A protein has these predicted regions:
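A short, conserved alpha-helix within the catalytic core of class I
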Residues: 149-157
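Adenine-nucleotide cofactor-binding loop residues
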Residues: 125
Length: 157
């Protein structure tokens, strides 16, 4: 997830009419030394970012309601806090995947999460990390901020 989206969610979180209520986003943005005005994200864009995230949260929650023992692969997770917003039961295996430096930043900025949760530091286009993912249950792949960064060849493989 790009810094622009994170800032949009933080703006939404402090709005009196918040759509997503992503308070972890606001906390994380407050801890990052960056001039967020460079993102040029405005109120309506922040709402759009939050609405997109909320819809993906709804779909993820519906999948987990139907599959109480599922695996969620959250690809290119960035600093997204979907696992905290959804708060899945401990029967759900949740795996956040992103580049190693992004995972390190996640660990520094976001709280620890219990249950069957782990973070994998890898490019999602590398297949080696998939070898460690058990294929023993229904699996949902969530990739909100990924496809626009893939080359055509990466997207097709």
């Amino acid at each position: 997830m790009c810094i622009r989206d994170r800032y949009g969610r933080a703006q939404d979180a402090v709005s009196p009419n918040s759509v997503l209520h992503d308070h972890y986003a606001a906390q994380a943005v407050g801890r990052i030394d960056y001039d967020f005005s460079k993102t040029k994200i405005k109120g309506t864009q922040a709402i759009g970012v939050a609405l997109r995230a909320r819809q993906l949260d709804v779909w993820t929650s519906e999948f987990l309601a139907a599959h109480r023992e599922a695996t969620v692969l959250h690809l290119a997770c960035g600093l997204d806090t979907r696992i905290f917003r959804i708060n899945p039961p401990e029967t759900v295996r949740w795996i956040d995947v992103d580049y190693p430096d992004i995972i390190a930043l996640r660990r520094a900025l976001l709280p620890e999460r219990g249950g069957d949760y782990r973070m994998v530091g890898s490019s999602v286009t590398e297949e080696a990390w998939l070898d460690d993912i058990p294929a023993d249950r229904p699996t949902l792949a969530v990739f909100e901020g990924l496809t626009m960064y893939l080359t055509q060849a990466e997207g097709q493989s």
